[in-house]
Amino acid sequence: MAGPRTTVEAQAFYRMYHSYADIPDPWDRMRWCRYSLGLLQKDVAAMVGMEEWLYQDLESGAFHRSFTPELADKLAALYGIPVEDILDDYTLFLHRGGGAFLRRYREAKGWNRQQLADHAKVGCTSIRTWENGQKSISHKCFDLLVENLGHDFTAMLHM
């Protein structure tokens, strides 16, 4: 679907969510913003300089590594919303620097790499390569970090 085929489709979406604040998912927030501006997916994609298929995937909840921080910032600016509103936790983590964020988290906790590795239940070598940007953190590893580090990890992510 490139856009609401009818105003009925957009109205049905608006009935599902009474206000923007009610929308829990980033992809539905993007759809809400697009509908409120009366734009098609292809229009939004062209306006921010991304491929139409990528924007369609984003509105379907399929985030990709090709959804760069720069594209996220452009999309948020177009919609006039904070970039955090359109990113899931993993994409927000990447937007905040991935390994660089992990280093900031570790330093805020007062831990060395081995202590972080112990808490996260991953190898110290993984921590080092992630922090140094030698290796990117997969979605699976991010989920492991969230599970093992707990609420304060995601809370810091949203600060």
Q: Can you name each region flagged by the protein language model?
A:
Residues 49-66, 91, 122-136:
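Recognition helix of helix-turn-helix/homeodomain-like DNA-binding domains
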Residues 31, 56-57, 87, 128-129, ...:
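Key DNA-contacting residues within the recognition helix of helix-turn-helix
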Residues 3-36, 88-108:
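A short, Lys/Arg-rich alpha-helix, primarily the initiator
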Residues 30, 55, 83, 102, ...:
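Short, structured motif recognition centered on aromatic/hydrophobic residues
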